Amino acid sequence: MDAELVVTPPGCAHLGSFKVDNWKQNLRAIYQCFVWSGSAEARKRKAKSCVCHVCGLHLNRLHSCLHCVFFGCFTKKHIHEHAKSKRHNLAIELMYGGIYCFLCQDYIYDKDIEIIAKEEQRKAWKMQGVGEKFSTWEPTKRELELLKHNPKRRKITSNCTIGLRGLINLGNTCFMNCIVQALTHTPLLRDFFLSDRHRCEMQSPSSCLVCEMSSLFQEFYSGHRSPHIPYKLLHLVWTHARHLAGYEQQDAHEFLIAALDVLHRHCKGDDNGKKANNPNHCNCIIDQIFTGGLQSDVTCQVCHGVSTTIDPFWDISLDLPGSSTPFWPLSPGSESSVVNGESHVSGTTTLTDCLRRFTRPEHLGSSAKIKCSGCHSYQESTKQLTMKKLPIVACFHLKRFEHSAKLRRKITTYVSFPLELDMTPFMASSKESRMNGQYQQPTDSLNNDNKYSLFAVVNHQGTLESGHYTSFIRQHKDQWFKCDDAIITKASIADVLDSEGYLLFYHKQFLEYE
């Protein structure tokens, strides 16, 4: 269905309580004094006065109430408590100037406020002697010609299918096609490429995978219906990830990790000059979206000293019941069997079960003693993994392919996965409230920072030796489509949730404003 002309919906309905006498003057004063702070004197005043009125700190995403003089931490919910007790539902974030509505539970957009914010930002930049991060767009001759031939502007409606496009299978390349579908429907990645944010610094842009992905996004969202032929993408993947070269069937999960790695390496120059305190920190779009932090706590069984390490991750690989992993806790009444070289387990396993198994303490045993820094000797220990930092997009890899010296098989155990997922119980901050790895329902229903929504599912049909990959993609909130190479068909939510599941892609429901 083509896009059609529509009237855009109104913004936040709760702004009326703020837009009263002299509201523009008051808002300009807030931006000048507490957000942009163009002069050195204003910056000193901001550093001195902008602290949380509850805890006295200024590092926890400080917000200012728009209805009264109150500064509060967003991370520690001090501004939330103020909003609830005073019924002051609007606040401004003091780092980037976003307006947050506590009734909408999200940052909101208002054209009038945006104009004031941009004007005050430009004034501050001028006082500081700096320019805008991105220059004003000037259309090329080719773009001017295109604009002449396309004078009407189209807006995407809830029934629009722009962005859905089939991909030609170039010879056992379904593993690549399903991952491309998931990446091109990742909201923040789509916004990055469609806003022309990539700045290629490679000597040969034709060998840059990020440039090719940018072209791919343009193809997907051009409105064309015919299947796209991703021959150049395949060539670049073969060039930069030699282990994937050739026309034999490959693992979709392996392709995902290889593609993210190449994109990460080719994104040099896209961080817009941002510098982190950690020189090893990368701020490219791939790391911003997909990188999380996995905390590993090793506890000595003698002195109970804890050694903690934090490692980055792009995906979370989860064991399944029916694998050769000896410590999988089968639920009462479950039975396992092997049929035609494939492992099956009766009963229903959930994604939460797999995450509970992933984050429970594991006794390392006497054969894996570590040298304890407290005891200064080798001792038995336990190891527990938790999430220190969650990525914007969480990819869960269900380990269905088992390779060992004795056997090679596919595990077809059905795993039930939800449309919405709360990762709070598996956070490092929730570890103390979880006894011996037992799952506990989070008590803070207002904590939305760790909540995710499903937007893509990759499935594998067939056996380990011969199979085929397809994917389900969420186009709008409740519209799903099945992508089978060049064929795109509409799917129901039941179709998605009843599928076997190999790779599950979840997107954060609420994002920090930046």
Curated annotation (Swiss-Prot):
Any Gene Ontology biological process: protein deubiquitination
GO cellular component: cytoplasm; nucleus; SAGA complex
Cysteine pairings via disulfide bonds: none
Keywords: Acetylation, Activator, Cell cycle, Chromatin regulator, Cytoplasm, Hydrolase, Metal-binding, Nucleus, Phosphoprotein, Protease, Thiol protease, Transcription, Transcription regulation, Ubl conjugation, Ubl conjugation pathway, Zinc, Zinc-finger
The keyword Hydrolase appears for this protein: yes
Residues the record lists as Phosphoserine modifications: S226
Modified residues (Phosphothreonine): T136
Binding, Zn(2+) 3: C65, C68, H82, H88
SUPFAM superfamilies for the chain: Cysteine proteinases (SSF54001), RING/U-box (SSF57850)
Sequence positions that bind Zn(2+) 1: C12, H14, C101, C104
Domain USP: 165-509
Active site: C174, H468
Chain positions recorded as Zn(2+) 2 binding sites: C52, C55, C73, H78
Zinc fingers typed UBP-type, residue spans: 10-127
PTM comment: Phosphorylated in G2/M phase, but not in G1 phase by CDK1. Ubiquitinated and subsequently degraded in a CDC20-dependent manner.
Subcellular location(s) of the protein: Nucleus; Cytoplasm
Predominant subcellular localization, coarse grouping: nucleus
Modified residues (N6-acetyllysine): K118
EC number(s) given by UniProt: 3.4.19.12
PROSITE patterns on file: USP_1, USP_2, USP_3, ZF_UBP
InterPro entries assigned: Papain-like_cys_pep_sf, Peptidase_C19_UCH, Ub_carboxyl-term_hydrolase, USP_CS, USP_dom, Znf_RING/FYVE/PHD, Znf_UBP
Tagged with keyword Membrane: no
GO MF annotation: an example: cysteine-type deubiquitinase activity
Chain's role: Deubiquitinase that plays a role in several cellular processes including transcriptional regulation, cell cycle progression or innate immunity. As part of the transcription regulatory histone acetylation (HAT) complex SAGA, catalyzes the deubiquitination of both histones H2A and H2B, thereby acting as a transcriptional coactivator. Recruited to specific gene promoters by activators such as MYC, where it is required for transcription. Facilitates cell-cycle progression by stabilizing CCNB1 and antagonizing its proteasome-mediated degradation in a cell cycle-specific manner.
The family this protein is said to belong to: Belongs to the peptidase C19 family. UBP8 subfamily.
Name by which UniProt lists this protein: Ubiquitin carboxyl-terminal hydrolase 22
Organism of origin: Bos taurus (Bovine)
